[in-house]
Regions:
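Helix-boundary/low-complexity linker signature
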Residues: 1-322
Length: 322
């Protein structure tokens, strides 16, 4: 993604065998739903750390990374990697975490994704009441696909581990998705006393948090770096910073959600807008970050978009012309 390179640390290969073993257990007929180009090289690994303290200017490469075609069209969040560990300065991925990930979103019909070169992950849109198993927070591109199609019904049945909303277990108070440094939680709870007002449901609280974070600073691709002596990136951004981009806003939202007792995580991927049936070139300009939060009534994770609408123009893909 087109965020400062020094902010990311590449994933180790500690879980490669586990990922490969899991994928090999899926019936071979999944391949019928995927068009592939055979390759012998190994995709580069996605980062498993996001170092927030070093964030500075965000670059926007015009290089195309994938082509996306949606049958129905609309705004697509293409989910890549989620991060659950937060220590005030860094987001990290649980290397050995395996879970059923409930995908809840819009119906885009069939979505075709063709990558330019290999990608370490399969970038996937959100669908209503869909789930898949994630290892280490992502769907690893073990087969090195550079072209794949997600059918109208959503993910192929063989990738669907569960697809029934409302059956997930309640949040665990020891969940990594609620974990925060003690000092961070205490300061965040002070802010929440004014933010939440009369909100009672999970969705109402999330909406109020999103409104607050979006209004906390302006959108700018060249914000000031966090100053020396600061101990928490999210709180520095909310209390002192004047500007930031999606990484800043998504981090602040995820931290406030956790402090409010709502399981949350930081997610990176791409945000693109497509016209029905029209291929669109996606560049690193479309790289994006957002927060996900767990809604226990649905038994699913929902997107919380906390970045101001100023960034919308920066997320427009380039339609192909004939």
């Amino acid at each position: 993604l087109a965020f400062p390179q020094e902010s990311y640390v590449n994933r180790s290969e500690a879980t490669r065998d586990a990922i490969l073993s899991w994928f090999q257990s899926i019936p071979e007929k999944v391949a019928e739903n995927v068009r592939q180009e055979v390759t012998v090289s190994v995709p580069a690994q996605e980062p498993d750390h996001v170092r927030l303290a070093s964030l500075g200017r965000r670059t926007e490469s015009p290089i195309t990374v994938m082509e996306v075609t949606a049958e129905i069209g609309g705004t697509l969040y293409l989910r890549g990697q989620d991060y659950d560990g937060y220590d005030g300065m860094t987001w990290t991925v649980s290397q050995h975490r395996t879970e059923d990930f409930s995908l809840t979103g819009e119906d885009y019909g069939e979505v075709s994704i063709r990558t330019v070169g290999e990608r370490a992950l399969l970038y996937l849109p959100y669908y209503p009441a869909r789930s898949m198993a994630l290892i280490g927070g992502n769907m690893s591109n073990t087969w090195s696909y550079t072209e794949y199609v997600i059918p109208r019904a959503g993910l192929p049945d063989d990738w669907r581990i569960t697809a029934i909303s409302g059956t997930a277990t309640p949040p665990d108070l020891n969940s990594p998705y609620l974990a925060l440094p003690d000092a961070t939680r205490a300061r965040a709870e002070v802010l929440l006393a004014d933010i939440l007002g009369g909100a009672s449901s999970t969705v109402e609280k999330a909406e109020k948090i999103g409104d607050y974070v979006r209004a906390s600073a302006r959108y700018d691709l060249n914000p000031s770096r966090m100053g020396e002596g600061e101990t928490d990136f999210a709180l520095w951004f909310l209390e002192s910073a004047e500007a930031g981009y999606c990484v800043h806003f998504a981090t602040a939202a995820a931290v406030l959600l956790r402090a409010a007792g709502i399981e949350a995580r930081y997610v990176s991927g791409y945000l693109v807008k497509t016209a029905p049936g029209t291929p669109a070139d996606v560049t690193e300009k479309n790289a994006h970050a957002w927060a996900e939060y767990y809604e226990p009534t649905l038994g699913a994770w929902l997107v919380l978009e906390a970045t101001p609408s100023d960034m919308a123009a920066a997320q427009q893909p380039t339609p192909e012309t004939v």
